[in-house]
């Protein structure tokens, strides 16, 4: 494999979603009831698990079991990753996923009898406390169980719901409503690389000079720019909302980037790190002290990686690209939410058909 080959144009996979990596499933659950605007998303690996890694670059992360993914440590494969709202309180949702996996006998074998396992369930949270009006409405173990059960019910390769779902239910990006987004690509060599994000950032996804989404400049297609009149009206409405409610002090963008290529744990660690470039292209600024930006990497190992020393480059580049596209899709899929916790306007509402 040459460096030129690594730069050949990739193709979008069938669903343009994380589930295009064979064996991965995604499930969402959200809180119900008045004042609730939060939820949990679970990425379920194939039975037997996937090689996993993590890279945390935000200054205010909320995570669980990320140390287990260090390549120097014992755990080789994990069965699920949890992305959740509720800030650090919401990490309790991973307990529900852990209990479900134990019932399936899935986890690290630690006992003499079959089924005596400890499921390692890495998790990360976004800040969305109070956005529905009820500060105490946050995901718990039952929310996590509902999300993993939803993932297990899906068919292989099923489309992934985007927008105001799961951990993206109460997400915001700068002044705009955020949410869940996903994207995938097939490399010239045949490997699939995909991402799922929860876009919930302190920084903005919108170029203030044009109204285009920053990430659209990196998708290979020329952004459709709004008219100056539409953009001016959008800025005015956002300013009015800011004056009324202020800005959220804490946020986080989360991502799971995955591939069917056979990666070592060290290679997966590199993939998690370079995938952060995709966040930086789509959101400005990123990785601040009040962000908890975290990227997980999963490798199912179904497809051997070319042994050439630079073969990983194509996977690394694609990982950043699909994270950028997933953030764009999250913002475009989000819908306006109004309620006692605030008014969170969507890009779709502000810019209309331009967002289609």
Which ranges hold each PLM region?
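A structural signal for small-residue-enriched, beta-sheet-centric alpha/beta enzyme cores
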Residues: 2-95, 99-356
């Amino acid at each position: 494999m040459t460096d030129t080959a690594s730069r050949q144009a990739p193709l979008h996979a069938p669903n343009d979603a994380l589930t295009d990596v064979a064996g991965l499933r995604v499930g969402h659950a959200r809180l119900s009831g008045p004042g609730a605007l939060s939820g949990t998303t679970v990425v379920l690996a194939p039975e037997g698990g996937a090689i996993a890694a993590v890279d945390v670059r935000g200054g205010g992360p909320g995570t669980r079991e990320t140390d287990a993914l260090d390549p120097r440590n014992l755990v080789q494969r994990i069965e699920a990753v949890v992305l959740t709202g509720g800030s650090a309180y919401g990490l309790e949702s991973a307990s529900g996923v852990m209990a479900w996996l134990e019932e399936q006998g899935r986890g690290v074998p630690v006992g003499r009898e079959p089924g005596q396992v400890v499921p390692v369930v890495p998790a990360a949270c976004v800040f969305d406390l109070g956005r529905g009006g009820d500060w105490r409405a946050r995901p718990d173990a039952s929310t996590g169980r509902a999300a993993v059960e939803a993932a297990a019910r899906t068919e292989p390769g099923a489309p992934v719901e985007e927008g105001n779902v799961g951990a993206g239910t109460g997400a915001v990006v700068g002044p705009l409503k955020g949410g869940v987004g996903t994207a995938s690509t097939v490399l010239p060599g045949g490997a699939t690389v995909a991402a799922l994000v929860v876009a919930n950032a302190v920084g903005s996804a919108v170029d203030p000079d044009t109204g285009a989404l920053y990430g659209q400049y990196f998708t290979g297609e020329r952004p459709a720019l709004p008219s100056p009149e539409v953009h001016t009206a959008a800025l005015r409405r956002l300013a009015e909302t800011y004056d009324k409610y202020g800005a959220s002090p804490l946020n986080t963008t989360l991502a799971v980037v995955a591939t069917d290529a056979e990666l070592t744990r060290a290679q997966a660690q590199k993939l998690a790190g370079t995938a952060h470039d995709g966040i930086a292209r789509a959101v400005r600024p990123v990785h601040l002290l009040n962000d908890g930006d975290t990227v997980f990497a999963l490798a199912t190992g179904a497809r051997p990686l070319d042994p050439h020393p630079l073969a990983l480059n194509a996977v690394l580049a694609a990982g950043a690209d699909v994270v950028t596209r997933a953030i764009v899709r999250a913002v475009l899929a989000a819908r306006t939410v109004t309620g006692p916790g605030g008014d969170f306007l969507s890009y779709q509402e502000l810019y209309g058909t331009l967002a289609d």
